[in-house]
Amino acid sequence: MRILSRLLLAASLPAAVFLTSCETSPMASSGGSYHVTAHRPQNPNNVRVKVSLSQQNVYVMEGDRCLMMAATTIGIPAKPTPKGNFKIYSKQEHKRSGSYGFRVQGDRIIPAEAGANIPGKYVGYPMGYWCEFSPSYGFHQGYVHLRPRSHGCLRLKGEAAAKFFALVHNGTPVNIADSQPEDATLGPKIKRIDDSKTPDP
């Protein structure tokens, strides 16, 4: 039954992932679902990703055409998101952190880093739809905050992560900078999300 469900989901994914508009509502929401739309690229080899650190925005572009845009969470000042030009080189739909997570002690769950001297079984935070662009740095599904909150990765909320995962491939260029030209034209249309009151998974 689980196999059939996954096959039906996989068959419906292209229609669900690639919609007809790059528009989103700029209103902020507190937790809950986060809807983004995406276009199917005409040539997947021309897809590129642009990240604005100052605006915490991700733009997936094909030339001047916006395929998808979404809010993101960037790294805290002590563990910043790296700047520069990169390429996606590893994708993993189901991934857990090898560094940050929990220690499970019977019925107790204690936040802990993997190497912490705390008893119990280590379980990493879920990082679904992982797209790695630099060793230990990637785009992945996770809570999105209005302020920097990650350990350097770029978090995408809910379906934004799944759609991003479908749009990029190994070799997709990624540019991460303080700002992007799209901040002025597309940035104001991006819906903000605030998961700051939501407990970590």
Task: Report each predicted region and the residues it spans.
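Bacterial N-terminal signal peptides that target proteins for export
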Residues: 1-11
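Residues at structural and domain junctions
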Residues: 8, 44, 74, 147-150
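Residue-level detector of transmembrane insertion/anchoring sites
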Residues: 11-13, 80
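Exported/periplasmic cell-wall-interacting domains
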Residues: 22-27, 102-201
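Cell wall/extracellular polymer interaction/catalysis modules
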Residues: 22-105, 110-122, 128-129, 172, ...
